[in-house]
Structure formats: structure tokens, C-alpha cells
Amino acid sequence: DRATRLVDQLLTLSRLDSLAQLDDVQQVAIADLLQSAVMEMYHPAQQSGIELRLHLNASHIVRTGQPLLLSLLVRNLLDNVVRYSPCCSQVDITLNAREFRVRDNGPGINPQALSRIGERFYRPPGQEAPGSGLGLSIGRRIASLHGMQVDFANARDGGFEARVYW
């Protein structure tokens, strides 16, 4: 339920904030990580009328990190796009040599709200879908712990895009 999810997110964020470095790191194949997340989110996406499309332009990318945290980063991005994209949207998840992107073909986000996306507890005005405003900030913190950065933007030809790069 919603309260349990909020408590889980707060605990996750608290744990991530206390980390100065990662322990128990290993080599993680980013293509495998993206494929697993797409498979996990496939059914919820279908229920919302959203098509997930995976494009592996660079399939042998490996990063050092904690697999569970990196998986959480990707799941949070996909959960966000499935939760907030309008019905009948297409979502492209694209892996390139130095980045991966999650992009929908919806209306994008108001420019004033866009500058605050990823802040803790921030939700754009008028948002009807349930959420806490923590998922993207958790993702941003996980990326930072792994030497990555996350940017959020409106795509040039429409839609919202999250870009994770290293």
C-alpha cells in the first residue's frame, strides 16, 4: 500500500545518504540490467496501455557497482515513466556506449516543474497519479554513488527523457 511504499522509500534514501562508498561491488552488464527491468515492468506497462521498447545500441557495456542498487535505479526510472505517461504512450529505453536513456512520447513536463524534477518530495502541480516524489531522487543518489549522473529533460520532438550517463 501507499504508506508502506513511502516508508520503504524513506528508509532506502536514508541508507543511501549514509553511504560514502559502495561495498561488495562487482561487474554489472548494463544491457542485462535493462532487459531484466523491462521484463519486470512489462505487465504493469501493458496494463497502463504503454509499450516498452528496448534498444541495445551497445550491448557489452559493463559498470562496476552494486547490482541491486543499479537495478533499483533502472526500476525507479521505468516505474516513473509507466506511472506518469499517458495511455497509449511508447517508451524507448536506449543503451549507448556512455549512457542509457528512458524516454516517453507524452506531452513532456512544464518547464518550471522540470527544473525541480528529482528533488526530494517534489511532485509537479496537478499530478493525479499516486507517488511520493522520492523515486527519481533515489535514482539520482544511486547514480552518484556509482560515478554516474542523471539529467531530466523534455525531448526536442516531445516527451520526457531521463538520461543516465558516465
Where is each model-derived feature located?
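A conserved beta-strand-to-alpha-helix junction within the catalytic ATP-binding
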Residues: 24-39
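Conserved catalytic submotifs in the C-terminal HATPase_c
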Residues: 26-27, 46, 51-61
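Short helix-loop "hinge" at the ATP-lid/N-box region of the Bergerat-fold HATPase_c
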Residues: 81-82
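Short beta-strand/loop element within the Bergerat-fold HATPase_c
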Residues: 88-99
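Short conserved segment of the HATPase_c
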Residues: 109-121
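Short alpha-helical Gxxx[C/S/T] motif in the catalytic ATP-binding
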Residues: 135, 139
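Conserved glycine-rich
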Residues: 147-148
